[in-house]
Amino acid sequence: MQQILTYFFLVVYSVTILGIILVIITENRNPLKTLPWIVVLVLAPVVGLVFYFFFGQNLSKQRIISRRTRKRITMQLEEPEHPEGPGIPPRYRPLASLLLNTLHSVPLYGSRIAVYTDGRSKMEALMEEIARARHHIHIQYYILNDDQTGCRLRDALVAKAREGVRVRILYDDVGSRGAKNSFFKGMRDAGIEVYAFLHVKFPLFTSKVNYRNHRKIVVIDGRIGFIGGMNIADRYVRGTQWGTWRDTHFRIEGSGAAGLQASFLSDWSATTKTHISGPEYYPPVGHFTDDILQIAPSGPFGKWRALLQADSYAIARARQRIWIQTPYYLPSEVLNTALQEAALAGIDVHLMLPARSDSKVVDLATHSYLDDMMKAGVKISFYKPGFLHSKLLIIDDMLSVIGSANMDFRSFEHNFEINAFVYDREFASRMAAIFEDDLTHCHTVTPGEWFPRPRTRRVAESLMRVFSPLL
């Protein structure tokens, strides 16, 4: 009897492994991704099964919100000129079309944009706008802590809810796991609608833990929006133990807020299974500037990796400069190659990273990519006063990209992210000035400094690079 059970479990086990291998093959992934999974499943089946369950499943064909619902929400945006019409510079019209076709990200005209480079100024601006709210406040953060900063926000929202303002909050269930349940319950008791995005009951027993909502947006009365890299926690305002927290966030007034509204309402519909609509959520707004922007929300569910495709497309067509700020650099092969080719072609490619991030493992993996970058002529600068958490891309003298997405596998493949693509010469000049000011606080490394690193350090970097897609 025992022998029969042994054979039975062996057959079931083998069929399971073969079935997963067949699924991986028929997903038609990049062979560089397919082959390692097959090797791990064959050589270490138990470990392979566990890792595949958490990190390997391809959810691109699944949807958390139907196309019909998404279209119904985005159709509430005021339909502007087609991106091939006047306004967007001819060089960037294909990029605008790419974002339109992959994300239904329509060009939005005439927004006024304020830029914040520290958490204190961003928080003060946010609190001022909350105090002015009259109809609704929509808030979405990856991290919503119950520390002093989080409690300050909570108290302001509770006060507005008591005034009759409709307050809705989405937070990521994994990113905000440090906050006590009582923190959210107190807001619900005050009449605020609070939901966790992709709720995870048992983090150790679900593959959903690998797919998180990394967006950081606020929309107030459909007229004012915030987007960028800052969450709600004390460290974004006060800094870290080893220095300041340097980040970038936008306050958008005008039509750009409608793009943030559409993203929030899509996530709200996916989370609560309720659809919110009405002209009060997309009020008429004036045109304040000549800025043209596209709000680009991307995620793991769907055919396209739109932010990766858009960044790669823009980088490959740069003519003068490509300036990047990112806390983590764990790029895809396509993006990494595009940057090296640009540098080899004589384009000014400059990558700014934190001298120290919040993860030593990620630092090691990031550094493994820098040798080839420097050999190609890419300038590498390390920000020294604290943690550089800013996510910024400047292409030539026209395109600026800011938002929640890092230059890493997780942002491009697994997370729900949102970036703003701004087409404007004057605005690009403003962002370049910020980049240049940050450079005064950086150390730009030379090949003579970088290449003689100890062999043990290089081995550690290479080892961590193997795990880049999981970090």
Stretches found by the model and what they are:
Residues 1-309, 313, 317, 357, ...:
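N-terminal localization/anchoring segments of enzymes in phospholipid and broader phosphate metabolism
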Residues 308, 315, 336, 349, ...:
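A general structural signal for well-ordered alpha-helical packing
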Residues 318-320, 328-350, 354-355, 359-361:
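Helical hairpin unit composed of two closely spaced alpha helices linked by a short loop
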Residues 324-326, 383, 402-403:
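Thr-Gly-centered strand-to-loop micro-motif
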Residues 333-336, 363-365, 395, 413:
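Histidine/acidic-residue-rich catalytic or RNA/ligand-binding cores of hydrolases
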Residues 338-342, 368, 437:
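Short, solvent-exposed amphipathic alpha-helical segments in soluble enzyme
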Residues 345, 349-395:
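A beta-strand-loop signature enriched in Asp, Gly, Thr, and Trp
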